[in-house]
């Protein structure tokens, strides 16, 4: 039974159910209820949103299990939680708690700088970040059921998420248009499993959903990522660090769903109050860029 529950087909199917939606970071039950009422398809339970993690510095770990439990009991939508890259026990604890997804996340301080989790060993589905197709396929090869761009979390600056999504999509088009005898060389170049390149060639797309994340702060940002081909969006600090979280949450959900209705997005963007304060990426030292974590 465990093997059936944890099969790739089941786990990827669960992720497909979130397609077209918004997943919001929350730090308590009240925020989780706001997210659910706004139309979020899932919430990510954590102790601090990425902008606060960035500001605090030091080591960022898995959220206190009491916070995760509080969020799980507050909402009926799926609940995700973050584990550190390579931290087997954090992931096993979250799996034992019954979370719906685990995010092996670069937002937290990596526990292992050499090895990511072997996600196929778990019954719970995983979401992982990527900056390019090589990273995406390595994570899928380890068992990830869902991808997201890394972007640059906690900045309110969407430029890195745009860069990562455009790069993945450009590399996908290249693979899809290759002849079969070129795929092995491309697999070597990407550092990715050959079998996954064959899947992409056959399917004409990634075998899992790919959401946008990292720096999304406004309804227009969310719509932009959908316009560029994202399957949905994660919003971290952008909602609950804004002036009016309830309005921002509802507006971002609507903009994600109706991303080509520009008149609607204009109306949604009126009277929202101030968005979260943004950071210029070029002003961040390389060691402060969360997207650099993992490989």
UniProtKB/Swiss-Prot annotation:
Alphabetized Pfam families for the sequence: SOR_SNZ
Domain of life the protein comes from: Bacteria
Keywords in alphabetical order: Lyase, Pyridoxal phosphate, Schiff base
GO MF term (any one): pyridoxal 5'-phosphate synthase (glutamine hydrolysing) activity
Catalytic activity line of the entry: aldehydo-D-ribose 5-phosphate + D-glyceraldehyde 3-phosphate + L-glutamine = pyridoxal 5'-phosphate + L-glutamate + phosphate + 3 H2O + H(+)
Binding annotation for D-glyceraldehyde 3-phosphate: 166
GO biological process terms, semicolon-separated: amino acid metabolic process; pyridoxal phosphate biosynthetic process; pyridoxine biosynthetic process
Binding of D-ribose 5-phosphate, residues: 25, 154, 215, 236-237
Catalytic site positions: 82 (schiff-base intermediate with d-ribose 5-phosphate)
Enzyme Commission identifier(s): 4.3.3.6
InterPro entries in alphabetical order: Aldolase_TIM, PdxS/SNZ, PdxS/SNZ_N, RibuloseP-bd_barrel
Biological or metabolic pathway of the protein: Cofactor biosynthesis; pyridoxal 5'-phosphate biosynthesis
Function noted in UniProt: Catalyzes the formation of pyridoxal 5'-phosphate from ribose 5-phosphate (RBP), glyceraldehyde 3-phosphate (G3P) and ammonia. The ammonia is provided by the PdxT subunit. Can also use ribulose 5-phosphate and dihydroxyacetone phosphate as substrates, resulting from enzyme-catalyzed isomerization of RBP and G3P, respectively.
Record-linked PANTHER family: PYRIDOXAL 5'-PHOSPHATE SYNTHASE SUBUNIT SNZ1-RELATED (PTHR31829:SF0)
Subunit structure: In the presence of PdxT, forms a dodecamer of heterodimers.
Similarity comment: Belongs to the PdxS/SNZ family.
Protein name in UniProt: Pyridoxal 5'-phosphate synthase subunit PdxS
Species name: Actinobacillus pleuropneumoniae serotype 5b (strain L20)
């Amino acid at each position: 039974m465990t093997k059936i529950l944890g099969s790739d087909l089941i786990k990827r199917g669960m992720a497909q159910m979130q397609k077209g939606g918004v997943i919001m970071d929350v730090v308590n039950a009240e925020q989780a209820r706001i997210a659910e009422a706004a139309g979020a398809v899932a919430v990510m339970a954590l102790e601090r949103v990425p902008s606060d993690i960035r500001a605090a510095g030091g080591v960022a770990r898995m959220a206190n299990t009491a916070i995760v439990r509080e969020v799980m009991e507050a909402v009926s939508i799926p609940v995700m939680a973050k584990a550190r890259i390579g931290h087997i026990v954090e992931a096993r604890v979250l799996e034992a708690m019954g979370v719906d997804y685990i995010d092996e996340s670069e937002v937290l301080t990596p526990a292992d700088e050499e090895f990511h989790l072997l996600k196929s060993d778990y019954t719970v589905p995983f979401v992982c970040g990527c900056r390019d197709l090589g990273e995406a396929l390595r994570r899928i090869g380890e068992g990830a059921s869902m991808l997201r761009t890394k972007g640059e979390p906690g900045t309110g600056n969407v430029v890195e998420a745009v860069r990562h999504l455009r790069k993945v999509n450009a590399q996908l088009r290249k693979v899809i248009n290759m002849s079969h005898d070129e795929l092995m060389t491309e697999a070597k170049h990407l550092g990715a499993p050959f079998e996954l390149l064959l899947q992409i060639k056959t399917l004409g797309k990634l075998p899992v959903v790919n959401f946008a994340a990292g720096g999304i702060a406004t309804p227009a940002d969310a719509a932009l990522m959908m316009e560029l081909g994202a399957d949905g969006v994660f919003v971290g600090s952008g909602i609950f660090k804004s002036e009016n979280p309830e309005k921002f949450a509802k507006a971002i959900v609507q903009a994600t769903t109706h991303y080509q209705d520009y008149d609607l997005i204009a109306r949604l963007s009126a009277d929202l109050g101030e968005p979260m304060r943004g950071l210029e990426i070029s002003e961040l030292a390389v060691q402060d860029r969360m997207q650099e974590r993992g490989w």
